[in-house]
Regions:
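Conserved flavin/dinucleotide-binding core of flavoenzymes
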Residues: 2-42, 323, 381, 388-560
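Mobile amphipathic helical/loop "lid" adjacent to a hydrophobic cofactor/ligand pocket
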Residues: 7-10, 15, 24-26, 128-129, ...
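N-terminal Rossmann-like FAD-binding beta1-loop-alpha1 element of flavoenzymes
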Residues: 50-80
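Core beta-strand elements of the Rossmann-like FAD/NAD(P) dinucleotide-binding domain
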Residues: 51-53, 329-338
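Glycine-rich FAD pyrophosphate-binding loop
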Residues: 72-98
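Active-site/ligand-binding neighborhood in enzyme catalytic cores
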Residues: 195-312, 319-321, 345-347, 352
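Conserved beta-strand-loop-beta-strand element in the redox core of flavoprotein oxidoreductases
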Residues: 310-334
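Flavin (primarily FAD) binding-site architecture
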Residues: 338-362
């Protein structure tokens, strides 16, 4: 909640306002994906003799869809395989008993990714391409969030700004900023990212990787004099910065957290109006204005019989001529000169029968060592945004507060988000959004049981508020660790894992691999340095691994 940009010194803030914006330009792989995407020459060139060649794309999440879309534009024929539904962790659902899916004004719940930072300019490129609109997401203490309640150890505090909270929260904010400046050259790295100063980015980051690769997030805090107080560390873990508490990330590598704060990945979030799953679905149907080989009006859907992707992949193996042979759930067997795997990488260890020859042994080790975060959510539809009603005291006098607020707590629910669709219109509450151990607490319970526990927990914070009477449909819930094609919400490296992540990330540079280990490319969340907000970048790199660039450097040269 104590977001870093609100805590910089005044002179730094003034300087930042006048400087170029922060984007996800690094720090691990400083490359201007936004400029690359905007180049009129496109992303690369495929020889005419290769036009129409089929390329398997396994996984229909955003990375897979972007990969297929860009391959199609160069004249190749992507063949998409998807085990469940297009969208991956961009999963938007409707509620039973409410307006039907596709109906104007239908209530939706974002079961996966639901908020995106402006700094993810490659992601925004495709949002704009798909004609989608965004709106501010109601994070704790965000400018467009009406109010926030922090409930810790039975003490409840109401706030519209940070200044409304007790002084200890400001102390925690200052401690976090001091920790970043002293231990991670925060302002220096942000300045380099704004200026896209590649030598300076590499200088700072290389030093930090050497120093901090074996350090946990919690250890980084403990090493800082600013966080010598356990109480400050405890509050920081429960309340955090940007989107809320971060104690579930305490065991992870501090390098993961630095990527988030350096690049503004947790700041100024926006949600997609109508749901994030529209993005991959619209790209599936989108007809590019400029394509090679294919006639005008060609889309990914048009290249697939019945407009549907092929089913789940059940086997991957290499065959003569260094081809990749794919078997799907119907028993159909097809062989390709190249394939791109964008699904959750543990699928290669469990759901899909794979040859060891698909990857070098060190890459298999990196896949096996991938670490995933558990995550659970539950949403309910309500009749209207009743939380904006003025609260009253025992005498019926207005208190000056909202009836209910975006809520951060150390209770079972942890994070509660209020999603407003306008005055007197049906709305949605995310009763609980949890991670890791907090998520596992919900795993044995079904949606109804979860809702009952959540309503009881929130009733202890808001004893005068009857949430139940406003609910107009059945709850929807997800535990990503229990989803058979995901087994977790997203990748988060543990200390010492930098070498594994670099190995997977640079896999697209296949001229470095033995000749008999080429042709199968890795992409997606698990391969990117960061989470869902950057899979378009990994898809672009994979696409560049297949194409030749007309005299301008693509992602490949940067990997050196």
């Amino acid at each position: 909640m104590t977001s870093v940009p609100t805590a910089v010194h005044d002179e730094q803030h003034a300087e930042a306002q006048a400087a170029p914006p922060i984007t996800m330009f690094g720090p691990d792989f400083p490359f201007a994906y936004d400029d690359y995407l905007a180049h009129p020459a496109g992303l690369g060139h495929i020889p005419a003799t290769e036009h129409g060649t089929e390329v398997a794309v396994i996984g229909g999440g955003l990375s897979g869809i972007v990969t297929a879309y860009e391959l199609m534009k160069t004249g190749l024929r992507p063949v998409l395989y998807e085990a469940d539904r297009i969208g991956g962790r961009l999963r938007t659902v409707t509620f039973d008993g409410c307006s039907a899916e596709g109906e104007e004004g239908a209530l939706t719940a974002e079961m996966g990714a639901m908020r995106f930072p402006p700094s993810s300019t490659a992601f925004q490129h495709y949002v704009d391409l798909a004609g989608l609109t965004t709106k501010p997401f109601p994070n704790p203490l965000a400018p467009d969030t009406p109010s926030t309640v922090v409930d810790l150890k039975g003490e409840t505090h109401y706030a519209r700004t940070l200044d409304d909270l007790p002084e200890v929260y400001t102390q925690v904010m200052h401690a976090w900023n001091a920790c970043l400046e002293e231990g991670a050259d925060f302002s220096g790295m942000q300045r380099a990212l704004r200026e896209r100063d590649i030598p300076r980015i590499r200088e700072i980051w290389s030093r930090l990787v050497e120093k901090l690769d074996n350090q946990t997030f919690y250890g980084f805090l403990c090493d800082s004099p600013a966080f010598k107080s356990f109480r400050h560390r405890e509050i920081f873990g429960q309340v955090g910065f940007g989107t809320g508490g971060w104690d579930t990330d305490f065991p992870n590598s501090i390098l993961e957290i630095l990527r988030v704060v350096y690049t503004g990945a947790d700041d100024d979030h926006r949600g997609i109006v109508g749901g994030s799953q529209q993005l991959p679905l619209r790209l599936w149907e989108h007809e590019p204005q400029k394509t090679v080989h294919w006639p005008h009006g060609t889309s990914l859907a048009a290249l697939h019989p019945g407009g549907e992707p092929r089913p789940a992949v059940t086997r991957l193996h290499r065959t003569a001529g260094n081809r990749v042979t794919v078997t799907d759930a119907t028993g159909d067997i097809r062989t390709y000169r190249a394939a791109v795997f964008t699904a959750q990488s543990w699928m290669l260890l469990s759901k899909i029968d794979c040859d060891d020859a698909l990857f070098p042994i060190d890459h298999w080790t990196a896949i096996e060592r991938t670490h995933y975060m558990e995550s659970s959510k539950l949403f309910v539809p309500v009749d209207r945004p009743f939380w904006l009603d003025p609260a009253v005291d025992e005498k019926g006098e207005p208190t000056g507060r909202d009836t209910m607020s975006m809520t951060l707590t150390d209770r079972m629910t942890r994070g509660t988000y209020l999603l407003d669709n306008g005055p007197d219109r049906p709305a949605v509450i995310c009763l609980s959004y949890t991670w890791c151990d907090d998520s596992l607490k919900w795993l044995p319970l079904d949606a109804g049981e979860r809702m009952e526990v959540m309503l009881k927990s929130l009733g202890e914070i808001y004893p005068k508020v009857d949430i139940r009477k406003h609910i107009i449909g059945n709850p929807v819930t997800v535990s990503w660790e229990n989803e058979p094609y995901f087994m977790g919400a997203f990748k988060a490296n543990l200390p010492g894992h930098y070498r594994y992540q670099r190995r997977l990330f640079t896999h697209f540079m296949q001229d470095r691999l033995p000749a008999d280990r080429r042709g199968l490319f890795l992409a997606g969340d698990d391969i990117s340095w960061t989470a869902l907000r950057r899979p378009p970048g990994k898809a672009i790199r994979t696409r560049a691994g297949r194409a030749r660039r007309r005299g301008r450097p693509g992602p490949g040269p940067r990997a050196g």
